[in-house]
């Protein structure tokens, strides 16, 4: 069974030079400077990593939605997207540049729109996980969930640097699986009422409740 869902973007109008209005739905955080804190950069990259593990064409979908939502003036191409995500200090190819607030907003908007397209898949997988966990059934016995966890582990291990301090708590497959399931919960949170705004705020003032 394939976890992938169709995420084909629609045609859009040309990008305008001013910041897209959709970004105005996310409040500017009360932080010093124009760059995002370390935790914010990590969490945004990880939520996108979970989407890539859910959707085989995740990277292309991110770029497609950037165009659809008129955010391609911010997320211009694959290299530009990689540079933004590489501000995550846990990455092997970490880039020492700030992730600006407007870049972070664009990534969060896209992540939340992708989450909405994948709501049914995310909800089903969390339900399967809960049922299997309650009955103490190994997760690998469910193909859909197993495929997601396997892809997430592969993405995580290939892109994150095990020598980074934040990696030390995630040295086992079980711990990485826990992270993957936790991120599914955050993706579902993004699909709820005012989920995008609430998730955005949580990136700066604490964990999603």
Tell me the role of every PLM-derived stretch.
Residues 116-200:
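Helix-turn-helix/homeodomain-like alpha-helical modules used for DNA recognition
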Residues 44, 69, 84-88:
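Non-catalytic DNA-binding core/recognition domains of DNA-processing enzymes
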Residues 43, 103-106, 141:
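Single-residue recognition of alpha-helix capping/boundary positions
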């Amino acid at each position: 069974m394939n976890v992938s869902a169709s995420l084909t973007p629609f045609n859009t109008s040309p990008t305008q030079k001013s910041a897209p209005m959709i970004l105005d739905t996310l409040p500017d955080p009360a932080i010093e400077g124009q760059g995002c804190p370390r935790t914010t950069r990590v969490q945004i990259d990880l939520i996108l990593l979970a989407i890539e593990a859910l959707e085989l064409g995740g990277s292309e979908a991110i770029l497609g939605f950037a165009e659809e939502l008129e955010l391609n003036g911010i997320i211009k191409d694959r290299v530009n997207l990689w540079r933004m995500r590489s501000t995550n200090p846990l990455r092997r190819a970490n880039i020492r540049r700030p992730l600006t607030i407007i870049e972070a907003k664009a990534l969060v908007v896209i992540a939340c729109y992708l989450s909405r397209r994948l709501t049914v898949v995310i909800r089903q997988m969390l339900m399967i996980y809960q049922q299997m966990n309650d009955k103490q059934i190994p997760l690998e016995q469910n193909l859909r969930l197993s495929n997601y966890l396997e892809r997430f582990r592969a993405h995580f291990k290939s892109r994150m640097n095990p020598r980074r301090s934040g990696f030390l708590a995630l040295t086992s497959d079980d711990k990485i699986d826990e992270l993957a399931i936790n991120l599914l919960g955050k993706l579902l949170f993004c699909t709820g009422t005012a989920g995008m705004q609430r998730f955005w705020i949580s990136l700066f003032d604490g964990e999603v409740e």
